[in-house]
Amino acid sequence: MARLKVKVWGEYACFSRPEFKVERVSYPVPTPSAARGLLEAIFWKPEFRYEVRRIGVLRLGTPFALLRNEVGNRMGAKPFFVEDARQQRTSLVLKDVAYLVEADMVLRPHATDPLPKYLEQFERRLKKGQYHHTPYLGTREFPAYFSPPDGEVPDGGLNLDLGPMLFDLAFVEDPGRPELTFKRPGRGEVQGYALPLFFHARIREGWLEVPAEKYQELYRLEEGHAKGA
């Protein structure tokens, strides 16, 4: 594996807490899955995965109430008129944020090229500001900017207990529960369901540490069910 470090920032961010069902309320820091999404936006290949190790808070951001238009229906196989499902909801978002993301790039079993090849491609894109698709801070309307770390360090006096936080979604292959169709790297499309995984999040001395054992739980759910399918 290889360690990556990226600075990300933006004018607005919203990393939604799941316990607020109607209105969106943001965590003060990206969830591990949101941080992974930022890295995948910069560079992604099916031959490797990112494991986020920790997230540093450079600028905590100011809570800001924002009225947004959202669609109340989930996208399904059948089309629907957006205007019929549009809703106005208040979101408590963050204004003016910046973070450091540290993660490991880990090869998947079917990879044929060495890890340094992908690491060099990532670092090259990071320095040039290139990306696979537009990175965003929690929601697509809040674009993210990124660069190599510039020496700025997290606030060592910042300590927060954030409570339960979404770690990631485990896409469990299960033909007996075909709620979703998704792709498995190196195998194509399969059917199954998404299972959310949580952990108790704490910011200590400006850093949110991501428990490494959660990745093992994620892989057991995804790969274990695939082997038994």
Swiss-Prot record:
InterPro entries, alphabetically? CRISPR-assoc_prot_Cas5, CRISPR-assoc_prot_Cas5_N, CRISPR-assoc_prot_Cas5d
Which residue pairs form cystines in this protein? none
Q: What is the lineage of its organism?
A: Bacteria, Thermotogati, Deinococcota, Deinococci, Thermales
What family name appears in the similarity comment?
A: Belongs to the CRISPR-associated protein Cas5 family. Subtype I-C/Dvulg subfamily.
Q: Which Pfam families match?
A: Cas_Cas5d (PF09704)
What are the record keywords, sorted? Antiviral defense, Endonuclease, Hydrolase, Nuclease, Plasmid, RNA-binding
What biological processes does GO assign it?
defense response to virus; maintenance of CRISPR repeat elements
Return the cofactor note field.
Does not require a metal cofactor.
Signal peptide from the UniProt entry: none
Report the function annotation for this chain: CRISPR (clustered regularly interspaced short palindromic repeat) is an adaptive immune system that provides protection against mobile genetic elements (viruses, transposable elements and conjugative plasmids). CRISPR clusters contain spacers, sequences complementary to antecedent mobile elements, and target invading nucleic acids. CRISPR clusters are transcribed and processed into CRISPR RNA (crRNA).
What Enzyme Commission number does this protein have? 3.1.-.-
Impact of changing residue 23 to Q on the protein? Answer: No longer binds pre-crRNA
Keyword field contains RNA-binding: yes
Q: Is Hydrolase one of the keywords?
A: yes
UniProt protein name: CRISPR pre-crRNA endoribonuclease Cas5d
Q: Which GO terms describe its molecular function?
A: endonuclease activity; RNA binding
